[in-house]
Amino acid sequence: MTAPTTDAAPAAGAPLLQVDAIDVFYGDVQVLYGLSFEVREGEIVTLLGSNGAGKTTTLRAISGLRPPRSGDVRFRGRSLRDVPASRRVELGIALVPEGRELWPQLSVRENLELGAYGARARAGAARNLERVLALFPRLAERRRQLAGSLSGGEQQMCASGRALMSEPTLLMLDEPSLGLAPVVVEQVMSVVAELHRGGTTVLLVEQNLRQALAIADRGTVIETGRVRLEGPSAALSANPEIRAAYLGL
């Protein structure tokens, strides 16, 4: 997929995404505490942690669905503090949510086309639809089928394809392998790696830590809403704490 061209690229060596000391609440309940990390252009970065650690909330904060109460999120050096979620998509940030959140009564093609709702994405919708269907041949076979009748793996493909219709620079995936058979998980991770090779920067939340660390450049471990560890994937895979707590070794 082509990357958005509406904003200047970050300077060489500069982060594409900066999450800077964000505090996020649900009502009076604080979920993230001064959380900070960055993603550089061209990377796959994975967020690791147990259920309830704050990984999904982090993605929602970046996408604008759960704005931080304090701290800041910057994309290409620009603060997103006053940028609504819809505008963030146009800037190049796309989220594939946990649970896929498709429109089950609409066809596969209609679900995909709904991902191209921004002005720039609408202009390239036909071209991007062809690319998505080439990336996911199963969707091409089922383009007229209702999304609600798809298998779990096919629904994940459809949700990912819908996000790609917006031509994201940063693609965020929340638990893409959740509930899928191992062979389908391998297919999903293969597609993520292929997107990365095509130039898409990826921020991945994934329950299958072995698979995530195998394709990611770096990882950030979140515990109770705070960054616990971060570093290259190889170093995290070899870390005794990570191996014991998350890999069962």
Predicted regions and their residues:
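Conserved ABC transporter NBD signature motif
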Residues: 71-79, 91, 124-129, 231
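ABC-type ATPase nucleotide-binding domains, specifically the catalytic core motifs of the NBD
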Residues: 27, 83, 108-127, 135-140, ...
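Helix-to-loop junction immediately C-terminal to a conserved catalytic motif
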Residues: 63
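Conserved ABC ATPase signature
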Residues: 146-150, 154
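Conserved catalytic motifs of ABC-family nucleotide-binding domains
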Residues: 167
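ABC ATPase C-loop
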Residues: 163-164
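The feature captures the beta-strand-to-loop junction immediately N-terminal to the Walker
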Residues: 48-50
